[in-house]
């Protein structure tokens, strides 16, 4: 596990702020934080309007469009003319109305803050490393934390329409819930039978025989407080000795 973490760090290098410029991280954030929903992309573009150099937007009477990294990402209308440059917000407002109408039902962490988006970028870049490390140190605490994160992103998916992402996190939540609940069940059972397991012997037919825990297992005969071995009614416990053998028993403990 440790070697895998070291290998990932060597392949990935230093944290993202060390080799991504602020604006590069911002551009990644624009198109990764909300890449599964058009409305999320539009919301980010509107928020980052002060950096119009990142986008090449043009407008005419019949067309508005923007390009990003030489790829046309937004186009409305026909007969586009790229001789007249405009801010990206003008293009988006022409197509989708004013800011207030667009942001009416946007979740707060999309509307507020480029910094939040960069933090999200860092978290997702190092998510596998974090999970590998914390699963090896605090396995169930990590699973519970991941369940909480999954719930947050399910809410985000419902708000923003990113149903694919919501489905992925819902599946993660379900799997981790099963693992955690299974462990909790075992803990509850261990607590429920904390005395029975150490102070008695449960026979195949379900009868409980008291045991002297002070005696070793190999003491004369056994550790039962009552003399002799417990009588096993095979017909009651297994139906027959044949059924017991079919169940894979290596040997039959006869009275």
UniProtKB/Swiss-Prot annotation:
InterPro entries: Arteri_GP5, EAV_Gp5. The keyword Kinase does not apply. It is found in: Virion membrane. Changing residue 34 to S: Complete loss of infectivity. Changing residue 66 to S: Complete loss of infectivity. GO terms for cellular component: membrane; viral envelope; virion membrane. Its main location: virion. Keywords: Disulfide bond, Glycoprotein, Membrane, Signal, Transmembrane, Transmembrane helix, Viral envelope protein, Virion. Residues 1-18 form the signal peptide. The chain crosses the membrane at residues 118-138, 151-171. Glycans are attached at residue 56. It is a multi-pass membrane protein. Changing residue 56 to S: Complete loss of infectivity. The keyword RNA-binding does not apply. Residues 19-117 are virion surface. Belongs to the arteriviridae GP5 protein family. Major envelope protein present in abundant amounts in the virion envelope. Heterodimer with the membrane protein; disulfide-linked. This heterodimerization is required for transport to the Golgi complex. Interacts with glycoprotein 4. This is Glycoprotein 5.
